Design a protein with these regions (language model features):
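C-terminal helical cap and adjacent loop that interface with cofactors, partners, or active-site loops
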Residues: 279-359
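Short, conserved SAM-binding/catalytic segment
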Residues: 50-57
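Glycine-/Pro-rich loop/turn segments that contact NAD(P) or position catalytic residues
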Residues: 87-187, 227
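Active-site-lining helix/loop region of Rossmann-like oxidoreductase modules
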Residues: 17, 152-296, 300-303, 314, ...
Length: 359
C-alpha cells in the first residue's frame, strides 16, 4: 500500500539536470510534449543554450563540483530529476545540494551502491522535509511496482524472484553502458534473510516464461535486490535477465578479471567500447517483458508479468515523468523512498502501452 502523501507548498517546477545527455534530452522533449516546463541544467553551456532555445525552456549552467553554482541552480524549484550518470560519482553532490535547499531528489540511477548511500540519509532527509527517491526510471519503477503488486496478492511471501527481457533492435543508452562497466567490480548481489550480500554462485541460470515459452535467464544485480526489500519487506530476493550467448561469455571473462576491474584505468579502457544509443526508430521496434514470482515456502505462490516499451529510454522517460508529475502536485513523503512505497503498485500502469497479466 502506498504511503500517505503529504502536501507541499513549494514551487511547481523542477530542474532537469543532465538535460543534454542521451536520456536527458529525450526527457526534455517529452516534458514539452506533456506541457511540463522544467529548467534544463548541466555543465555544457553551448549544448544547453541550443536545446533550451529549441524547446523554449529556461536553462542554468552548473557543474556538480561547484556547490555555489549548484545551490543557485536549485533556487525556485521543488524537485530535481537527475539524469547525469554514472550516479556512483554524480549522485552525492546533487543529494547534498537538495538537502541544503529543501528540494526533493529524483534520479534515474540503477546502481545499488547509490541506493545504499541515499538510504543512509533517510533521517537527515526526514528532518529537512525532503524526499529522496533514486531509481525512478525502468530501474526500478516497473519491477518495484510488480513486487508490491505480488506482495499484495501473497502477503505471506518470503521469496521474490524477478526477471526481464528486451526483444527488438534497441540497445542500451551510452550512460547505462558506462554504469554497467562501473558496477562490474562489485559482483552479483542477492538478498538473503534480509541481508544484502554477494551471490554465492557465479552465472546462476534458470528458466522463465515471459509469455511465449520458457527461456533461459541469468542472475544479475538489478536495483530491486536492494529496493524491493524496503518496498515489500520480502527477505529473499533474486533477479535475472536474458543475455545473448556473447554477453554470457563476456560476463564469465569479467568474473575472472574482477579484481582488475577495481582499477580505474581498466574501466576507462572498457568505456572506450561504449556505443551510441539506439535511435528512435530502433526503440519503437523494441518491447520489454518483466516477470515476477513470490512464494512463501509453504505452498503459496503468485506470479505476474508486465509488458511495455523499450526500457532504457522510452519506459524510463515514462516512469520518471509519472513520478515528477506527482511530486509537482505535492504528493511526496519525506525521507528515503522507493517509487512504489509512495505511489503504489499501479504507478507503472499509468505509463502508456504497459499491460499486466497474472500467471
Amino acid at each position: 500500500m502506498a504511503h500517505e502523501a503529504i502536501a507541499s507548498r513549494m514551487p511547481t517546477t523542477f530542474l532537469l539536470y543532465g538535460a543534454t545527455g542521451f536520456v536527458g534530452e529525450a526527457m526534455a522533449r517529452e516534458c514539452v510534449r506533456r506541457g511540463l516546463a522544467p529548467i534544463l541544467a548541466g555543465r555544457n553551456a553551448a549544448a544547453l543554450a541550443a536545446l533550451s532555445g529549441e524547446l523554449g525552456l529556461a536553462h542554468r549552467v552548473c557543474a556538480l563540483d561547484e556547490a555555489r553554482a549548484l545551490d543557485a541552480a536549485l533556487v525556485g524549484v521543488s524537485a530535481v530529476l537527475h539524469c547525469a550518470g554514472p550516479f556512483l560519482y554524480t549522485s552525492r553532490p546533487m543529494v547534498d545540494a537538495c538537502l541544503r535547499a529543501g528540494v526533493h531528489y529524483l534520479d534515474i540511477s540503477g546502481e545499488f551502491p547509490v541506493f545504499e548511500a541515499v538510504a543512509a540519509r533517510d533521517a537527515e532527509a526526514k528532518q529537512r522535509g525532503v524526499m529522496l527517491m533514486p531509481a525512478v526510471g525502468f530501474d526500478v519503477v516497473p519491477t518495484d511496482c510488480l513486487a508490491v503488486y505480488l506482495k499484495q496478492r501473497l502477503p505471506s511471501a518470503t521469496q521474490l524472484t524477478m526477471a526481464f527481457q528486451s526483444v527488438g533492435p534497441g540497445g542500451l543508452p551510452p550512460g547505462t553502458q558506462r554504469t554497467v562497466i562501473e558496477l562490474l567490480s562489485f559482483g552479483n548481489r542477492v538478498r538473503v534473510n534480509g541481508r544484502f550480500e554477494r551471490a554465492t554462485s557465479a552465472m546462476k541460470t534458470r528458466s522463465v516464461n515471459f509469455g511465449v515459452g520458457p527461456v533461459e535467464v541469468t542472475q544479475l544485480t538489478w536495483g530491486d535486490v536492494f529496493t524491493a526489500y524496503y518496498s515489500t519487506g520480502i527477505p529473499n530476493i533474486e533477479e535475472y535477465t536474458v543475455l545473448p550467448k556473447a554477453a554470457r561469455q563476456s560476463m564469465t571473462v569479467m568474473r575472472v578479471l574482477q579484481p582488475l576491474l577495481a582499477l580505474r584505468f581498466v574501466r576507462a579502457l572498457l568505456r572506450r567500447g561504449v556505443k551510441p544509443g539506439p535511435s528512435a526508430s530502433r526503440r519503437a521496434q523494441t518491447v520489454t517483458h518483466v516477470w515476477g514470482e513470490v512464494t512463501d515456502g509453504v505452498g503459496g505462490r503468485a506470479a505476474a508479468r508486465l509488458h511495455g516499451p523499450e526500457a532504457g529510454v522510452e519506459w524510463t522517460v515514462a516512469c520518471a515523468l509519472a513520478v515528477v508529475e506527482r511530486v509537482l502536485r505535492g504528493e511526496v513523503q519525506a525521507g528515503y523512498q522507493t517509487p512504489a512505497m509512495v505511489y503504489g503498485s499501479e504507478l507503472v500502469m499509468t505509463c502508456v502501452g504497459v499491460t499486466r497479466e497474472d500467471v
